[in-house]
């Protein structure tokens, strides 16, 4: 079975990319357990708690990330450099994601056969 990586690299609510990626991730998790989830660049904002998407007339899909345990999605990484650049090092995110430096993150990403970016 191919290993599939989902990479979230865009901020939430500015486009449908994050929501579509999350929908694809949850659907794919029904077919395989060989999944990895990566949050890089502005994608780290996907995991911030306390977002108010209704203020910009967007759907609140961020709470759906909390379903990772229910879907047995446990391979989750977040870019440590992206967190530092955005001043987010000491935040409790909506999911448990392991911070990795860019070199280690690229190495981990290299273990996947398919990479889908949202």
From Swiss-Prot:
GO biological process: tRNA processing
GO CC, one annotated term: cytoplasm
Compartments where located: Cytoplasm
Sequence similarity: Belongs to the DsrF/TusC family.
Entry-linked HAMAP family: Thiourid_synth_C (MF_00389)
Function: Part of a sulfur-relay system required for 2-thiolation of 5-methylaminomethyl-2-thiouridine (mnm(5)s(2)U) at tRNA wobble positions.
Keywords: Cytoplasm, tRNA processing
Oligomeric and partner information: Heterohexamer, formed by a dimer of trimers. The hexameric TusBCD complex contains 2 copies each of TusB, TusC and TusD. The TusBCD complex interacts with TusE.
Name by which UniProt lists this protein: Protein TusC
Primary residence: cytoplasm
NCBIfam families referenced in this protein's UniProt entry, alphabetically: PRK00211.1, sulf_tusC_dsrF
Domain of life: Bacteria
């Amino acid at each position: 079975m191919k290993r599939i990586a989902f990479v979230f690299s865009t901020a939430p609510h500015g486009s449908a990319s994050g929501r579509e990626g999350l929908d694809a991730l949850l659907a794919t998790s029904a077919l395989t357990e060989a999944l990895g989830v990566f949050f890089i660049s502005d994608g780290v904002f996907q995991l911030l708690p306390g977002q108010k998407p209704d203020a910009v007339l967007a759907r609140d899909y961020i709470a759906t990330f909390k379903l990772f345990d229910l879907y047995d999605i446990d391979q989750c990484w977040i870019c440590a450099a992206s967190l530092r650049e955005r001043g987010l090092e000491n935040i409790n995110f909506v999911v448990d994601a392991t911070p990795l430096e860019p070199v280690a993150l690229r190495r981990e990403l290299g273990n996947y056969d398919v990479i889908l970016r949202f």
